[in-house]
């Protein structure tokens, strides 16, 4: 189990509206409720998922000067000493529509202060990375900042976990970043954009994993929504961890919760990956039953109860 995890990534203010279903171009739909604001961003979601599973979490992120950190990041175990403030940009924004029909979402992001983070900003927080068992990053800050954070991690023997989302428009990631990544955790769509191999069955997931192994990554996790998650290590160990079957209300932050919660149970040598993934799946099953991003992320005791009830 990890003792300290650093999350390098985004903070957004989520503006969420429910719709009966997703419309088509030119169509107008009534919404059953007003727009709801909540804290989110893939980075902060993952950080909160780690913190709520009772592990110290260093949050390296950048927000606008207007952001009230004490209020908006008031989460036990979440260390906000590494939050930075942009002089020129406001806090990032995410505009989220959630289908009441399926619980699925569509998200549009304005980067704001997330895009203002620099490699110098990251390097200034080397101490946070050095004390960690894992560094987790996503792609809502610049590619350069993620590479810098992973360089620091590797310089200090810290394992790196990459959630390659949102994927760049060209569908590619720098070879340098892949080579600095110990664990990559895309979903089925993201891995298709990276590898060109569509996920249709376990054999195709193995083919996807081979692509990453050739580029220096030792451990691959591919999430496939309600079907669960596939894993494979370079030593040949592989399998599928099924999801917990629940009725989804809102899938926002489901993947972030899985990654953050899973990482808290991982041993630094990754020898308990399936067990850690099952913990992450249990946490994610709670998230999808609730509305919103950060508000939906469960506490450790809730996750442990799900595991106990599903032995």
Model-derived segments and spans:
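Conserved phosphate-binding/catalytic region of the ribokinase-like
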Residues: 1, 202-311
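Positively charged, low-complexity intrinsically disordered leader regions
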Residues: 1-25
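Substrate-binding N-lobe of the ribokinase-like
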Residues: 4-5, 29-93, 306-310
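Glycine/charged-rich beta-loop-alpha catalytic/anionic-binding loops adjacent to active sites
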Residues: 25-34, 238-246
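Short beta-strand scaffold segments in enzyme catalytic cores
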Residues: 48, 93-97, 106, 228-232
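Surface-exposed amphipathic alpha-helices with a cationic face
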Residues: 51, 147-155, 213
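Conserved phosphate/ATP/ADP-binding segment of small-molecule kinases
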Residues: 155-238
